[in-house]
């Protein structure tokens, strides 16, 4: 009696079904199907031995009517169709199934069904314009028999025909008739992308040729642009220096890109003493005031670039001392460059040359007809610039003369020693 009394409360305590009622288990088939689908996407491309094994196992397995059975095409070769649980169901159509074909075999539906259009097998893929690129390549009609170019042995024998890594072969490429075709919806494609699996289209030989031609055209365009840039370059070739010293007729043609007509018209005449010195031998175009010039020199440009030992400041202001040697005609050209051509006749009548121009002040300018204060201020400012540049050039000439003297002394000392 005592033992039966003890058993009753124990049974009541351990009978948990009364406290926690039984519930239906959660449906995890969707998660399992996703895991299987992701695992299938990472599999290697089936080889010939695997195809034979799968064919023999399918013959020994279930009948041809089951979803995992074999379907024979017109040639009698077994063709396996695996359906994903994602799309399988009592009311799901056969076109939405997940189909995996081995290479070298042609997929065919039941004999009573008409052959589908090339876009019909991509119903799960089509989601507006997101898969437009994949559908465009599938527009080629399926061939009746697979060619030898698409077989795996051809790919192994000629690796240059499709130079892609093994990852490319595992990607879901657009449907070649002999390549495995995987129909993926938008959510599954996003899963693949999250896992780092690339779903890109294998490039054909035509696209590679187009890329190569584009690269060639880009290179030729760059070379043409580079030649155009060198043609208009401000730097001169070495043949210019040699021809200009000889005074040959070809120097005029070689210096045509660099000698601008503005500064050629304003280049001053040079005396024999200027030709003998190095600093007076060139008049570059980049000086701040515009310098008038005399008759145009034909065989020689007015600013050859062979004053390499000078500094940049000396090089820019090299032609400014020529104002001391200006004639009245060059003074008139200088006034034209300042848009003061209305006073050029009075300056020419008074025979104002370069040295007289540097000595002009306010009263002399008024006597020359410059009644406008703005014009007088402009002329004074330009004259100050000319005078400052002339002084600077004089100091630069003295400096170069001292450097030459030092070099001569060093050469003499080296010869004596």
Curated annotation (Swiss-Prot):
Residues 138-153, 244-260, 276-289 have a biased composition (Low complexity). InterPro entries: Neurabin-like (IPR043446), SAM (IPR001660), SAM/pointed_sf (IPR013761). Residues 326-389 form the SAM domain. Pfam families: SAM_2. Residues 375-416 form a coiled coil. Residues 40-49 have a biased composition (Basic residues). Residues 36-302, 390-417 are annotated as: Disordered. The modification Phosphoserine is found at residues 84, 108, 173, 179, 279. Keywords: Coiled coil, Phosphoprotein. Residues 159-173 have a biased composition (Basic and acidic residues). The modification Phosphothreonine is found at residue 283. PROSITE patterns: SAM_DOMAIN. This is Sterile alpha motif domain-containing protein 14. The gene is Samd14.
